[in-house]
């Protein structure tokens, strides 16, 4: 099976992936999400300049250990960002070349505009969203106007502690079905020990 381009993102219940100014402080964390297991499903991550700058604004230079990070930008200088590939090429052509190589899946990280462009080009294979129990009322939408696709639900997980609902969809016509949600840790089931029965009282023998 060829590599899949998977769009994975957190989204509010009313369909926004960021606040009006790119804010991400509304994202809810849940200890059941195993990020190390999630990252092992990919060896390449791609994003646009805006998403990259929001990521680096929190510290660091955006490099991810064990992953090839590809950033599409016409203004960033490659020499300034070690460990990251800054490209000015057409993202559609780059994605097609990446998918032709051997390796794990490719993560399309954030960025509604890039998602719309690549979706319209027919190179996105899955849509995997973590729906947060949050209403923003305004912000950057999951999918700007201009692209449509039919989806098929592959898996879903509900995280009771936080109220997050994780949904994994295949895009019909894509390269294979979407994966099951394996990076959510199973709920721990504690076996209840049966209470020990009280010791039976010995009957006293009657004296003759």
Where is each model-derived feature located?
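Enzymes that bind and transform nitrogen-containing heteroaromatic metabolites
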Residues: 1-208
């Amino acid at each position: 099976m060829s590599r899949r381009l998977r769009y994975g993102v957190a989204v509010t219940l009313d369909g926004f992936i960021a606040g009006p100014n790119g804010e991400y402080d509304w994202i809810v964390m849940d200890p059941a999400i195993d990020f190390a297991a999630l990252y092992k499903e990919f060896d390449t991550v791609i994003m646009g300049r805006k998403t990259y700058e929001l990521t680096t604004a929190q510290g660091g230079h955006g490099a991810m250990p064990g992953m090839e990070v590809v950033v599409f930008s016409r203004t960033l200088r490659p020499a300034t960002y070690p460990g990251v590939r800054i490209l000015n090429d057409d993202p559609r052509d780059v994605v097609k070349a990446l998918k032709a190589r051997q390796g794990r899946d490719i993560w399309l990280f954030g960025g509604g505009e890039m998602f719309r462009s690549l979706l319209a080009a027919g190179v996105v294979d899955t849509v995997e969203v973590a729906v947060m129990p949050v209403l923003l009322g305004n912000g950057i939408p999951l999918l700007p106007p201009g692209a449509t696709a039919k989806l098929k639900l592959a898996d879903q997980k509900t995280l009771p502690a936080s109220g997050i609902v994780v949904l994994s969809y295949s895009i019909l016509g894509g390269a294979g079905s979407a994966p099951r949600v394996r990076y959510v840790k199973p709920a721990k089931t504690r076996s209840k020990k049966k209470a020990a029965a009280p010791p039976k009282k010995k009957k006293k023998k009657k004296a003759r």
